[in-house]
């Protein structure tokens, strides 16, 4: 009988943990959704840049955001302590990582930015550039200052 109780207890714990995992609601967003809360980018990025948190806590690991800048916009040279996985949703964006050739992103294209890699970008004239970015660690952005910029 003791073995039977162990099996039942284990099954109950498994089912309860499955229910707990499913308690977080699924979600889907377009960058045009009115319910998104857009906030400012770090101060070193010119006015016009906005970020909307889609999922997670920016102070913790595994946060997803939309990053939006208007057309004809320069994103200054910077780096992150976290790696970032990106998909361009709108616009045309040229991204240049230090020591590598520039990559011209079109909607639907994926890009990976390693942690600590310095990079800058230019959104082409026309549509705003909207990037979906999945950060592995807490979100930050450090400007590259001085002659190395």
Residue spans of the language-model regions?
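Double-stranded beta-helix
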Residues: 27-30, 120-149
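Short acidic-glycine-tyrosine-enriched beta hairpin
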Residues: 99-116
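Bacterial N-terminal signal peptides that target proteins for export
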Residues: 1-9
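Conserved short histidine dyad/triad with adjacent acidic residue
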Residues: 63-80, 114-115
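Glycine- and acidic-residue-biased ligand/ion/polar-headgroup-sensing regions
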Residues: 70-73, 80-98
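Short beta-strand His + acidic residue motifs that chelate non-heme Fe in jelly-roll/DSBH
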Residues: 75-77, 95-96, 113, 118-125
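A short, N-terminal "cap"/entry segment at the start of jelly-roll beta-barrel domains
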Residues: 22-63, 146-149
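N-terminal signal peptide c-region/cleavage motif recognized by signal peptidases
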Residues: 17-19
């Amino acid at each position: 009988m003791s073995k039977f109780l162990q099996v039942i207890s284990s099954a109950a714990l498994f089912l309860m943990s499955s229910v707990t995992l499913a308690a977080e609601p699924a979600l889907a967003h377009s960058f045009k959704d009115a319910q998104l809360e857009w906030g400012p980018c770090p101060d070193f990025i010119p006015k016009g840049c906005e970020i909307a948190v889609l999922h997670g806590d920016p102070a913790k690991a595994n946060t997803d955001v939309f990053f939006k800048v208007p057309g004809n916009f320069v994103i200054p040279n910077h780096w992150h302590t976290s790696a970032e996985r990106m998909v361009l949703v709108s616009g045309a964006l040229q991204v240049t990582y230090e020591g590598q050739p520039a990559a011209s992103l079109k909607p639907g294209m994926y890009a990976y930015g390693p942690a600590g890699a310095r990079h800058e970008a230019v959104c082409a004239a026309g549509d705003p550039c909207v990037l979906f970015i999945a950060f592995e660690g807490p979100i930050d952005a450090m400007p590259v200052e001085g002659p190395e910029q």
